[in-house]
Amino acid sequence: MDNIKRVILKLSGEALAKKEGGYNDELIENIANQVKTIVDKGTDVGVVIGGGNYWRGRSNDNIDRTKADQIGMLATIMNCIYVSEIFRSQGLKTNILTPFECGSMTKLFSKDRANILRKALLYSLQEEQDIHISQQIQVLY
């Protein structure tokens, strides 16, 4: 992995959950440790997280498609906040980028912020050990 500059890791919401509900802390801590090992070698890591442990699309025809998508986005943000805190407990710096304002817990996604990740090809983010946890941006109908 010494020559790999950047990795994107996709974590489904369902993968984060225990069968009986709640988060699988042992698994998430293990993922955080593995990510830290990669970051410590100088590789930039972006994490995309799903919300499927809370919400799997529109389950009721009485719910508008747009509202169902918004519920999914909120579920994803909850997962991002949780995973971010586990990553921080392992010594990683995190930022949560979302497509809409969500208080001080997240940063609004913008093209400029996305370019920060692209610039990492030229300027290493290694010093900050920055892990960007991005909500999967869904198409709104």
Task: Annotate each PLM feature.
Residues V39-D40, R88, R118, Q136:
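Anion (oxyanion) recognition and catalysis
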Residues G42-G46, A120-L122:
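Loop/turn-to-beta-strand initiation segments
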Residues M1-D44:
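N-terminal glycine-/serine-/threonine-rich phosphate-binding loop
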Residues G52-W55, C102:
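Short active-site-proximal "capping" loops at secondary-structure junctions
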Residues A17-K19, Y54-R58, C80-I81, D130-Y141:
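Short glycine/serine/threonine-rich phosphate/pyrophosphate-binding segments
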Residues N24-E29, F109-D112, Q136-Y141:
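Charged helix-capping and loop-helix junction motifs
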Residues I8-S12, I49-G50, L97, S124-E127:
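Short beta-strand segments
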Residues N62-Y123, Q129-D130:
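Ligand-binding beta-strand-loop-alpha-helix segment within the catalytic cores
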